[in-house]
């Protein structure tokens, strides 16, 4: 089932398409939409092991290269932020990036810190990243330019999924894809970055993406959004967990994911 669902999602990777082309998009405006599928910490050769993706590339797809090196170094959070900024960008440390779904208390915290209205997903500590980029960035990039441009043009964005891990019984949140989708104030109109995983002791850190839920939410989100960012998460967790595995168990887990 996991391979089937990933294959389904992978066929839409960074594709601009007419909504009416797909069965779940009936009765929706024919304006083009984008589904951005993030498979972090993997390679093109691994991606091409997915039959449906390979066939899409052979028949009508293209491969592009993008320099996503961040300001002051190359790591996941700077790379995601640089994609969203349209140039090399700097952000706060990992522990100071805090994307959370909207709630009454979280909205109060966000609005008190930023003076801006909260949206569906908000970076509660966005000012740390803004200040880090302003004070130490060398390229003049503006965080959240992509999301802001979407918002300014009346286009709605959504983020689904995360790369969270569990270590020593503690949840360590990783929602860095939101750095690509957010507006200049660290906001994303809607999505689900909290309840998209399931317990799976056979997978890295004892959790995995709930693909059944992800595919349902992707279909539903597609109806009312123009750009959907989907974080698969499992490829990141596998790469991070690799030192805990031997060659055989690593390959077995990779096969389950891909």
Give the role of each language-model region.
Residues 2-11:
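Sec-dependent signal peptide recognition
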Residues 13-18:
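Hydrophobic core
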Residues 19-27:
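Sec-dependent signal peptide cleavage junction
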Residues 26-32, 42-227, 233-240:
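Active-site-proximal alpha/beta segments of enzymes that process anionic O-linked groups
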Residues 237-244, 248-250:
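Intrinsically disordered, low-complexity regions in plant nuclear regulators
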Residues 252-258:
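Metal-dependent active-site segment of extracytoplasmic phospho-/sulfohydrolases and closely related
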């Amino acid at each position: 089932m996991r391979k089937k669902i990933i294959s389904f999602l992978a066929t839409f990777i960074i594709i601009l398409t007419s909504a009416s082309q797909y069965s779940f998009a009936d009765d929706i405006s024919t304006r083009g939409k984008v589904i951005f599928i993030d498979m972090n910490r993997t390679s093109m050769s691994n991606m091409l092991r997915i039959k449906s993706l390979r066939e899409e590339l052979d028949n009508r797809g293209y491969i592009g290269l993008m320099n996503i090196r961040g300001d002051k170094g190359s790591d996941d959070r700077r790379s995601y932020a640089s994609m969203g900024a349209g140039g090399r960008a700097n952000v706060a440390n990992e522990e100071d990036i805090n994307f959370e779904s909207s709630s009454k208390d979280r909205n109060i915290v966000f609005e008190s810190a930023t003076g801006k209205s909260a949206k569906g997903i908000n970076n509660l500590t966005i000012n740390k990243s803004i200040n880090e980029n302003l004070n130490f960035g060398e390229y003049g990039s503006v965080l959240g330019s992509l999301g802001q441009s979407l918002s300014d043009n009346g286009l709605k964005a959504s983020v689904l999924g995360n790369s969270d891990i569990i270590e020593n019984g503690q949840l360590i949140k990783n929602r860095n894809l939101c750095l690509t989708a957010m507006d200049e104030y660290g906001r994303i109109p809607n999505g689900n970055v909290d309840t998209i995983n399931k317990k799976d002791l056979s997978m890295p850190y004892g959790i995995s993406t709930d693909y059944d839920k992800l595919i349902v939410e992707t279909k539903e989100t597609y109806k009312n959004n123009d750009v959907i960012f989907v974080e698969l998460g499992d490829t990141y967790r596998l790469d991070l967990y690799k030192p805990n595995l031997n060659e055989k168990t690593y390959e077995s887990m990779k096969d389950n994911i891909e």
